[in-house]
């Protein structure tokens, strides 16, 4: 670089100003940086390296790399798929470059247009509006003075009619075949993406999601539709021939079980709501969907588009309203064949007991519940990377993810540094309106959630050590906001239950006791997600072997499972399985039938004559 500097700086040269910089810091901070720069500048293709090569033509050295790439006949590598084609058999969902001002401005303009008119939702019984039930205003969690729409909740009679109609329609839907059903799901995926701004508006204002979380929620819904459509074509499109002796033909086919009640949560009001009904529909079931009380507007828009995509209105019914009241009718109805549920462990247990107490066939229960999710950071981990991933895992979506980290186990040797770095990083989190791109943490869903979290924080302040508890600004005074907080616990026993919000609990552990950490996590009975930061392969192998957990993430955050790539679901108190977005999920919605035919009765096996 010195030779280049001498050619550029000075009045008798090119008279161009140059900046000289000298990184300052400790050995542990700067060594990695120095090695990286040495590797970059020492590479054969490096500008600095080639500049010192007397045999290298100047024209080659100063050539514009963009111009050189444009000369290539084929810029993409033929064996590296483009983002839209990374998943074989289906199109990837569309993302949005929110960091780009023009892209973000276009999205915001569409959101403003969508919010210009209040939204409405109501029960859809055979596609017809049911306006008999109670009317309720829907306000935004970031500002309860902002009314964004209203919902007519279904009454008990409407729920019963929905179940009866869905039962009558199910057989024809099952007989329509996987290819026909898949075409409708694929069409629905396209309609969802065509309504990105409308969904984003609702996800931000009704559910309190940030802009990037809103886009991610929509993308996951689209991925569910296309993934289950792909599976329906492959596995629900006719019988599979099984092996057997000559003179006999054995076939196995998959069929819908009947009517599925799909009961979804508010934290992923589009993705999980869509995933449940898409899986049930793809498998040949009819569906009665019951969305969370907090997010009926999003559910209504989704069902409306599913009907527009061709799903028969009698096959897909919508019954928004109070969970206990509607759930009682759904679970007791004789037409019920299965329940897909995502929510609390307590509610899942109530559903399970209600199903077991029924007379007749016991409906199938597919439940995904919560978890005492932890991240383990040992002394070999990169502190900056670990803290970055802890922030995302614990505080993204205001900690309102099933997969969010509730516990951070950090090794004694590095605990002081990691906790100090975490405290500093948390101090920079911006809490506020989720519509603002700079916001890191938005509101929690409602006043009940806020009150419960504040009560827990008060107990932690009284009984444990406070690391940091962020203040809330005046702009948060009209919403249900909870300031992010971190507490250091004396042991995991101090955490009695899952805390569903932006609160992190830190526990130190000795370097030779990682096995004890695994045992403590298993002892909770939960098994949803686990994060691990280590550069020691044997540690990763031991933790993977010992911890009973559905989804484990190594040296990354533990949120944002991708459909088809990271099937999601837990074990133990965290759910029944199988995993949503995985190859075995649809099978749980289906029943198997085998037909064995004696071919000798019609003349034997003619295929033998052509051997």
Give, region by region, the residue ranges found by the protein language model:
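Long hydrophobic segments that form regular secondary structure
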Residues: 1-10, 16, 412-413, 418-419
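Conserved C-terminal structural/oligomerization subdomain of aldehyde/semialdehyde dehydrogenase
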Residues: 17-24, 30, 35-58, 141-151, ...
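Hydrophobic face of amphipathic alpha-helices that form TPR/SEL1-like repeat modules
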Residues: 39, 44, 49-150, 168
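Glycine-rich loop-to-alpha-helix module at the N-terminal edge of alpha/beta enzyme cores
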Residues: 132-139, 144-236
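Residue-level signal for inorganic ion chemistry
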Residues: 145, 166, 181, 203, ...
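Rossmann-like NAD(P) dinucleotide-binding subdomain of oxidoreductase/dehydrogenase enzymes
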Residues: 204, 234-387, 577
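A short hydrophobic/small-residue beta-strand
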Residues: 286-288, 467, 551
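ALDH superfamily catalytic-core signature
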Residues: 305-311, 332-333, 338, 346-490, ...
């Amino acid at each position: 670089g010195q030779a280049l500097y001498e050619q550029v700086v000075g009045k008798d040269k090119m008279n161009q100003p140059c900046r000289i910089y000298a990184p300052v810091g400790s050995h542990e901070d700067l060594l990695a940086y120095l090695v990286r720069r040495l590797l970059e500048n020492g590479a054969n293709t490096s500008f600095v390296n080639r500049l010192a090569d007397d045999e290298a033509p100047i024209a080659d050295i100063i050539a514009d790399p963009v111009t050189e790439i444009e000369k290539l006949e084929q810029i993409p590598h033929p064996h590296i798929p483009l983002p839209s084609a990374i998943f074989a058999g289906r199109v990837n969902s569309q993302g949005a470059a929110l960091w780009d001002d023009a892209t973000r401005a276009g999205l915001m303009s569409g959101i403003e247009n969508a919010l210009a008119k209040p939204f409405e939702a109501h029960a859809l019984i055979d596609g017809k509006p049911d306006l008999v039930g109670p009317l309720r205003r829907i306000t935004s969690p970031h500002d309860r003075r902002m009314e964004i729409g209203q919902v007519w909740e279904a009454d008990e009679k409407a729920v019963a009619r929905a179940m009866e109609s869905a039962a009558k329609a199910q057989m024809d839907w099952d007989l329509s075949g996987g290819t026909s059903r898949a075409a409708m799901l694929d069409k629905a995926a396209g309609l969802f993406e065509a309504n990105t701004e409308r969904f984003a508006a609702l996800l931000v204002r009704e559910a309190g999601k940030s802009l990037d979380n809103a886009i991610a929620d929509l993308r996951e819904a689209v991925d569910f539709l296309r993934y289950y459509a792909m599976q329906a074509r492959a596995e629900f499109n006719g019988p599979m021939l099984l092996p057997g002796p000559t003179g006999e033909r054995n076939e196995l086919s998959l069929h819908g079980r009947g009517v599925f009640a799909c009961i979804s949560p508010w934290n992923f009001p589009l993705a999980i709501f869509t995933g449940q009904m898409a899986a049930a529909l793809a498998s040949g079931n009819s569906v009665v969907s019951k969305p969370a009380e907090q997010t009926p507007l999003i559910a209504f828009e989704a069902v409306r588009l599913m009907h527009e995509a061709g799903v028969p209105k009698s096959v897909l019914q919508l019954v928004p309203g109070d969970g206990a009241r509607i759930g009682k009718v759904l679970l007791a109805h004789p037409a019920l064949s299965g329940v897909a549920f995502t929510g609390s462990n307590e509610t899942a247990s109530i559903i399970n007991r209600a199903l077991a107490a029924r007379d007749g066939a016991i409906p199938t229960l597919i439940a995904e519940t919560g978890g005492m999710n932890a991240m383990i950071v040992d002394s070999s981990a990169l502190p900056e990377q670990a803290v970055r991933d802890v922030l995302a895992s614990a505080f993204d979506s205001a900690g309102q993810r099933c997969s969010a980290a509730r516990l951070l186990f950090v090794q004694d040797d590095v605990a002081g540094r990691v906790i100090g770095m975490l405290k500093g990083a948390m101090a920079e989190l911006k809490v506020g309106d989720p519509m603002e791109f700079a916001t890191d943490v938005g509101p929690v869903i409602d006043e009940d959630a806020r009150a419960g979290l504040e009560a827990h924080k008060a107990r932690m302040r009284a009984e444990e050590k406070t690391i940091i508890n962020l203040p809330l600004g005046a702009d948060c005074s009209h919403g249900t906001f909870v300031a992010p907080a971190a507490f250091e616990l004396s042991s995991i026993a101090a955490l009695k239950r899952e805390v569903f919000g932006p609160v992190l609990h830190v526990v130190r552990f000795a370097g030779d006791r990682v096995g004890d950490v695994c045992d403590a996590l298993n002892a909770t009975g939960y098994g949803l997600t686990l994060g691990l930061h280590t550069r020691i392969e044997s540690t990763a192998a031991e933790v993977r072997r010992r911890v009973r957990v559905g989804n484990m993430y190594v040296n990354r955050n533990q949120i944002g499972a991708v459909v088809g790539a990271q099937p999601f679901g837990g074990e133990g108190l965290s759910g029944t399985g199988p995993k949503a977005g995985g190859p075995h999920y649809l099978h749980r919605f289906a029943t198997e039938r085998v037909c064995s035919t004696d071919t000798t009765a019609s003349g034997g096996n003619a295929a033998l004559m052509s051997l």
